[in-house]
Amino acid sequence: LVDTLPDITWCLNQVLLEQGCPALTAETVRGYIGGGVTAMIERVATQFGIADAVALHQRYVTLYQNNLVQFSRPFSGVLALLEGCRQLQVPLAIVTNKTEEMARQVADALLPQNTFGTILGHRAGRALKPEPEVAWEAAQRLSVDPQRCLFVGDTEIDLKTARAAGMYSAAVTWGYGLTPTLQAQAPNFCCEQPAGLLRILQQVCGTAHVFTDHGDTVKSY
């Protein structure tokens, strides 16, 4: 939905510069995204031999909380996608490994109000993706059968979550994941642009069979 890489990169580089480490390119940071902030910081700490990953994590989180939407913007085409979903009356939820508070702040700042029925992020006692519980919780809050849900994501962790939760999956290649990596997870759909995802929803909304017309072949949009 939102390209948060610029703010993540900026904050991470500020923390690294404080440690006397060189700055990372956005493309390098892109490869570290997935699995939550703790996993990202652990990868960075390992790369630079930083012993106190906990302190690094705390400093990064503090900085990022104050710079959530300095450079972040919705991906091109996302606002039109959300408007299309509104017209189709598709119930939507956000499921993220960001902290729930951060996810809500980003959505409130950059996405249309009242778009999402629920926003679920990381918090104490809630397992991160790819564990399926958070996806099931989202479906429950939307009053939708998980087997009728389409779980959309740009990382292999998202697609593993969909599989674990028994949901249909759509890989989107405009985000952070590499297309071959996403395709290796055999998603039900693969979308290069938000408009492609909207076409999927337009095709299946109001039909009784719900997604089953695609068979076992990945459809690209």
What are these regions (language model features)?
Residues L1-G31, Q47:
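Active-site neighborhood of HAD-like aspartate-dependent phosphohydrolases
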Residues I8-T9, A26, V37-I41, A53, ...:
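A general structural signal for well-ordered alpha-helical segments in protein cores
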Residues V15-L16, G36-I50, V106, A138-A139:
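Helix-loop "lid/cap" segments that line or gate small-molecule binding pockets
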Residues R43-A80:
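Metal-dependent phosphoesterase signature
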Residues C21-P22, I50, P112, V144:
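Helix N-cap/coil-helix junction residues
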Residues R86, T99-E100, R104-Y221:
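Asp-based, Mg2+/Mn2+-dependent phosphohydrolase catalytic module
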Residues N66-I94, E100-Q105, P132:
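Short, acidic loop-to-helix structural element flanking the phosphoryl-transfer center
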